[in-house]
Amino acid sequence: MASALSNASRRGVAVRLAFNVDHANPIPVPPPPGGEPSVIDGLDVPTKPIPGVPDLMHHKYVVRDGEAVWTGSTNWTDDSWSREENVIAVVESTGVAHSYSTDFEQLWSTGDVAQSGFVDPNPIKVDGKRVRAWFAPGRGEAMAIRIAHRVARAKTRIRVSSPVLTSAPILGALAEAVSDGKVDIAGVVDATQMKGVYHQWMLNGNSDWKVPLIARVLGGAPFSGKLSTPYGQGDVHDYMHAKVTVADDIVFIGSYNLSHSGEVNAENVLEIRDAELADRLAAFVDEIRARYPAAPLPA
């Protein structure tokens, strides 16, 4: 990837790279990606470090020539490509590219996560399909509520793939759907990271009210959990990292973990109404969850 960026610059392409900068605060759950400073420093392109304080610059997207967007859950690290479950979406649309370019300019001009994501999620037609681009933190709360709304309105199926699951509106919608028992619901999380979430909840006591919700969701529907390697410098990073929600024929795909903290990170999500794509991604979620045992429940 580094070579591709440098080669594009040498061809005369205007390349800019914004990236998250680590900080000394406690490691969040899920943990941020680990970049290689020497690789970034060696790039022959303008770069912009975005301080991940207090909230992460968590995007993984590219805008090409104002015509296409490459996005999803995949960090640009070796382990992301070889050891983790991830998703990538490529959208050829000037309208979608404009939305992503607007978000990028907000980050680039301010260098501040909190000043980005203020992009209206207006519907855009792409090959006859309706697409909306959501960004956080500017539209983070609305983004989570939108996903929860679609989950609550689902009539036939819900599929979820997310390293963690802590967003209150989404948890509430899932718990209600599981309790109603009218919709085919299944999903997959990262077991190690969910155990970390439970530990944090136990220590701070501020999220005790979420415990029955997550227990209802993970215990009442077939959710699996990948027992990944715990986070640590130099360790293997093999998380279950795909971020996908399918509600009937609507897909949400991007960088956003279904977490409360994700609402204030720099994040992006594509909402796509496409029955064929929904079938494909629902099958992908089922393929992942078939690999792993049942997700852990809070003690």
Predicted regions and their residues:
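Short, contiguous strand/loop micro-motifs
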Residues: 24, 133-135, 161
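Active-site cores of enzymes that catalyze phosphoryl transfer or operate on phosphate-rich substrates
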Residues: 109-138
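PLD/PLD-like phosphodiesterase catalytic module centered on the HKD motif
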Residues: 2-69, 74, 78-83, 90-109, ...
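Long, repeat-rich segments with strong aromatic
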Residues: 155, 162-165
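Extracellular/periplasmic Venus flytrap/periplasmic-binding protein
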Residues: 130-153
